[in-house]
């Protein structure tokens, strides 16, 4: 008899000790509540031991059965990547094992260049490819924001324009073969894009999302979907800030595509790229080979980091 539990996806689960695979992937995370899916497609509500919170959507984990609907997460398997943010007070895991970050932005409501820049740095630090999605591209307010994003195309970040209700399919070739995550401010259209890409899957996953979100109209948890056998997509809650306290100041220049080729070229090995003579970074900014605003951004992030 199929389970009536809202997190089970209506999948029948016989004796768990006889049928359960001991590995699974976290497909939803909400505080200390998780949904995991085993290789045969069965889903379970999951908890952790000792109130551990170091698990993320996308993690592949070892599990132990509790009953036909619930399991305990014992530990995570080695990660390919981990995307997270950290400020002076706390660390927030965003997603594990993703290979591509899509930063969804739009001219309305007010877009945050600060968030965009920081998310790109976090992706570089995690070894994750990054793509910028300019959503709501048909709005008249888009022209100015589009112009600002052209700079990031020169750095090698693709910028893809979408109108979520009309041409979300433009993203399919970009997503194909990747474990993707959509990230951005609230109101940028991440969930609308996700629903458009899911198509017929939307109704099937709606009960789980509604249960996790407690009836809210905005995404409050990370949720992983399979677009096909080779492609996954994580929809994540909206962000306003992206702390980078987990980064090391000495490594920062390597995360800037426009400055990494200058690493090691300054006269002094401990150059702060400010007033030192023979600074390759400062020279590049002064001659127009690099953006003075980007150098100021690098300096500002360096000042934020502890130590």
From Swiss-Prot:
Q: Where would you find this protein in the cell? A: Cytoplasm
State whether it acts alone or in a complex, and with which partners, per the record: Monomer. Associates with 30S ribosomal subunit, binds 16S rRNA.
Instruction: Extract the GO molecular function terms from the UniProt entry.
Output: GTP binding; GTPase activity; metal ion binding; rRNA binding
So where does Zn(2+) get bound?
A: 266, 271, 273, 279
**Organism annotation:** Neisseria meningitidis serogroup C / serotype 2a (strain ATCC 700532 / DSM 15464 / FAM18)
Q: Which CDD domains match?
A: YjeQ_EngC
Q: Binding of GTP: at which residues?
A: 135-138, 184-192
Mind telling me what this protein is named? Small ribosomal subunit biogenesis GTPase RsgA
- What EC numbers are recorded for this enzyme? 3.6.1.-
Any idea what job this protein has?
One of several proteins that assist in the late maturation steps of the functional core of the 30S ribosomal subunit. Helps release RbfA from mature subunits. May play a role in the assembly of ribosomal proteins into the subunit. Circularly permuted GTPase that catalyzes slow GTP hydrolysis, GTPase activity is stimulated by the 30S ribosomal subunit.
Q: Does the keyword Transit peptide apply?
A: no
Q: What is its main location?
A: cytoplasm
Q: Region labeled Disordered — which residues? A: 1-20
Which residues belong to any copy of the CP-type G domain?
85-242
Gene3D superfamilies given in the database record: P-loop containing nucleotide triphosphate hydrolases, Probable gtpase engc, domain 3
The record lists the lineage as: Bacteria, Pseudomonadati, Pseudomonadota, Betaproteobacteria, Neisseriales
UniProt-listed GO biological process terms: ribosomal small subunit biogenesis
UniProt entry keywords in alphabetical sequence: Cytoplasm, GTP-binding, Hydrolase, Metal-binding, Nucleotide-binding, Ribosome biogenesis, RNA-binding, rRNA-binding, Zinc
């Amino acid at each position: 008899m199929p389970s009536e539990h809202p997190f089970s996806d209506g999948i029948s689960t016989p004796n768990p000790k006889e049928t359960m695979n001991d590995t699974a992937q976290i497909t939803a995370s909400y505080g200390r509540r998780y949904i995991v899916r085993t290789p045969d497609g069965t889903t379970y509500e999951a908890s952790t031991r000792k109130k551990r919170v170091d698990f993320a959507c996308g993690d592949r984990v070892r599990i132990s059965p509790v009953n036909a609907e619930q399991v305990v997460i014992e530990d995570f398997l080695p990660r390919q990547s981990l995307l997270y943010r950290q400020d002076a007070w706390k660390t927030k895991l965003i997603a594990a094992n993703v290979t591509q970050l899509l930063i969804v932005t739009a001219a309305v409501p007010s877009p945050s260049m600060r968030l965009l820049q920081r998310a790109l740095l976090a992706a570089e630090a995690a070894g994750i490819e990054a793509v910028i999605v300019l959503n709501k591209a048909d709005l008249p307010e888009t022209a100015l924001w589009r112009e600002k994003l052209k700079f990031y195309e020169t750095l090698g970040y693709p910028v893809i324009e979408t109108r979520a209700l009309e041409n979300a399919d433009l993203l399919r070739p970009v997503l194909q073969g990747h474990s993707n995550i959509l990230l951005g401010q609230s109101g940028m259209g991440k969930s609308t894009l996700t629903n458009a890409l899911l198509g017929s899957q939307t109704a099937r996953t709606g009960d789980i999302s509604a249960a996790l979100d407690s009836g809210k109209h905005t995404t409050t948890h990370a949720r992983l979907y399979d677009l096909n056998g080779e492609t996954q997509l994580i929809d994540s809650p909206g962000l306003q800030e992206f702390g980078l306290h987990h980064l090391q100041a000495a490594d920062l220049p390597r995360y800037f595509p426009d400055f990494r080729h200058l690493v090691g070229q300054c006269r002094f090995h401990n150059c702060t790229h400010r007033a030192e003579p023979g600074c390759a970074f400062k020279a590049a900014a002064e001659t127009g080979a690099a953006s003075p605003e980007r150098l100021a951004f690098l300096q500002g992030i360096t000042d934020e980091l502890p130590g």
